Amino acid sequence: VPKNDHGPFSHEGEQYWGPVNWDNGGMEHTTLHLLYSRFWHKFLYDIGVVHTKEPYAKRTSHGMILGQNPHYVGNVSTQEEKDALIAKYGNQALRPAVKMVKTLGNVVNPDDVVKAYGADTMRLYIMFIGDFEKVATWSDDAVKGCKRFLDRVWNLADQVTEEDGVSEKNAPIVHKTIKKVTDDIDTLKMNTAIAALLTMVNEFYSNGLRRGHFEALLRMPSPFAPP
């Protein structure tokens, strides 16, 4: 076990390893763990043990994925049924989506999704569900849509010609999509990056595609659905 008789940790080690480059967490992480980690780090900074005021060079917070609300008034047809739900569940009955909890039976098991649609579909949908930092509602229909997109990419292989490079007809959409996906990944806009890929695939089905088009298409979704 390493020992240091001169301080809580090595000054050289702290200079090398700190601060954390990027810390990400949900809202509960932000209001609980982050509060204490910053408090202790600022204390250590005040007594001269660490060299930065903040423990993290960059901080982001992702949104929560909600589940369907089984007690939502929109699930019933008569006013009497709606009034009964409001009387029993209050304002919660007015929200179509709520936090996933076992007692409501609205928890989505990732293993079930992977078994039904594959891991690539699961990863792609989580990135496509909405803006990184905002709340989003899980949708089984949207999961199926992501699976259809991956199937369309797979089926494009049958339409690839033996010509190399990129045709003049497809060059604009290919280069535009490469830039869009690159920029969006850098700014955590995964959903709009994937939307651009959907558009490009539609163009390929309309215009036909060469080997160069298909190679570009297979590279761009790699962060979401590795080949």
Where in this protein do the model-derived segments appear?
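Structured secondary-structure scaffolds
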Residues: 1-162, 173-202, 212-220
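Beta-rich accessory regions
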Residues: 206-210
